[in-house]
Amino acid sequence: MSKYSKNEAQDWANINVTGQWSTLMTPFTPEDDIDENGIRSDVRRLIELGSQGAGCTWGMGEFWSLTTEERKQVYEIVSDESEGKLLTAAHVSHSSIKTVIDLATHAEDQKFDLLVLAAPYFVTKKENQVIE
């Protein structure tokens, strides 16, 4: 995993996370497989429109309905199609910390610019525990 300080990350975000961003939906084929061509088409369209970035497997991307392997497949497709032409963010939340680490590592390997991690959504903690 990348090593950087909180301040370095904030400085990078202040400079780079600007403009219009979009959340990619995860399209499926009639056979209920990930629609690779659909994802590629959506990414190309965002680039054509001048979007600054795209997030995948977020709420609109139905992260809760995808297997870990499907989420990784989406990361691979988005990374390949975006080719550095827009910033990419991967939602890596899961109820298992091992799966979070696996997804985060895979997204980093695919050269994603940002990771999005929501606070645990099953057994929740007090506000100060989440912030820590």
Question: Whereabouts are the PLM-identified features?
Answer:
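Active-site beta->alpha loop and helix N-cap motifs at the rims of alpha/beta catalytic domains
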Residues: 2-132
